[in-house]
């Protein structure tokens, strides 16, 4: 009989994730960075692997991470849910719901997860029926494009970026731990801190593209500027934007190479938090689990 168990996430679970998803999720080094180098999850209570097992065989996996988040001057704790995978041989219709119930915590103001258009609606139904009726879906689109113009900028240091004012940016504190963590990301060979006036951005460069990892203000102006800066660093730029900016950003691109819909679902346990959450929210690469 299959049961739910809790274990610390380890390298041993990399092959399990590959099997459950049927594809590589960034490589073993990425899993190591994502879960084992995470500076805010050093204790078992802060990051928990929830597994569905039949004797010694793993049939499903879910990861719950406890994070201190902030947006503008609002501080609160969240339960970030990710790496959900269920083996195709599992026929029970309740396992998905039970994973979310197993991950529920009483010490957070919100549950957060990311997924595509189809799955996010299923997850929201589970949230509203079993966790909280106070939910919100924030739709984004991840674009890979060729910028059509160069924008002026200057290189700066992570220390200066930490002093910048990050507006409507949901995630962990932009302190030295956060920037040291992003610099260890295995997919980028160089991390650049850039600014122009009061605009700041963090860009990661790989052989494939320059990716916008963090931005001080998720406005059209700031996105357009950061994308133009990426043009100096690579012919291709990858960026996640709110879907409301889709047409205007695509109009400024020489070519849109790829796009992928991503949604952030938040289930609130505090009315104060949900009421103060701005309509235009952005989440940096570090905090997208």
Residue ranges and their predicted role:
Residues 3-8, 12-56, 61, 68, ...:
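Amide-forming acyltransferase catalytic core, primarily the GNAT-like/NAT-type
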Residues 33, 37-39, 66, 109-160, ...:
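Active-site/acyl-donor-binding loops of N-acyltransferases
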Residues 38, 66-72, 97-100:
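Catalytic micro-motifs at enzyme active sites that drive phosphoryl/nucleotidyl and oxygen chemistry
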Residues 46-50, 75-77, 192, 263-266:
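Short beta-strand micro-motifs in enzyme catalytic cores
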Residues 55-56, 104-109:
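Secondary-structure boundary elements
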Residues 61-83:
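A broadly used, surface-exposed interaction patch
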Residues 75-88, 206-218:
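Conserved acetyl-CoA binding element of GNAT-fold acetyltransferases
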Residues 83-105, 219-231:
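Conserved acetyl-CoA-binding loop-helix of GNAT-fold acetyltransferases
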């Amino acid at each position: 009989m299959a049961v739910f168990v809790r274990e610390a996430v380890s390298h041993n679970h990399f092959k399990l994730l590959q099997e459950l998803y049927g594809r590589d999720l960034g490589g073993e080094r990425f899993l190591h960075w994502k879960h084992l180098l995470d500076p805010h999850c050093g204790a078992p209570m802060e990051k928990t692997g929830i597994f569905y097992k039949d004797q010694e065989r793993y049939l499903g996996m879910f990861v719950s991470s406890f994070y201190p988040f902030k947006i503008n001057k609002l501080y609160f704790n969240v339960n970030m849910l990710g790496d959900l995978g269920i083996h195709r041989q599992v026929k029970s219709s309740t396992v998905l719901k039970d994973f979310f119930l197993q991950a529920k915590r009483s010490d957070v103001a919100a549950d957060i997860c990311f997924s595509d258009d189809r799955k996010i609606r299923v997850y929201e139904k589970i949230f509203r029926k079993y966790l909280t009726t106070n939910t919100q879906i924030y739709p984004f689109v991840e674009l890979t494009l060729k910028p059509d113009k160069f924008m002026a900028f200057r290189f700066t240091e992570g220390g200066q970026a930490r002093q910048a004012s990050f507006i409507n940016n949901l995630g962990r504190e932009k302190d030295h731990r956060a920037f040291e963590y992003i610099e260890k990301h295995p997919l980028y060979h160089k991390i650049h801190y850039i600014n122009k006036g009061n605009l700041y951005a963090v860009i990661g460069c790989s052989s494939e593209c320059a990716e916008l990892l963090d931005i001080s203000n998720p406005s059209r102006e700031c996105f357009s500027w950061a994308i133009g800066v990426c043009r100096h660093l690579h012919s291709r730029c990858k960026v996640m934007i709110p879907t409301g900016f889709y047409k205007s950003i695509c109009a400024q691109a020489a070519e849109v190479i790829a796009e992928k819909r991503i949604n952030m679902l938040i289930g609130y346990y505090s009315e104060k938090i949900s009421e103060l959450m701005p309509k235009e929210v952005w989440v940096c690469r570090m905090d997208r689990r």
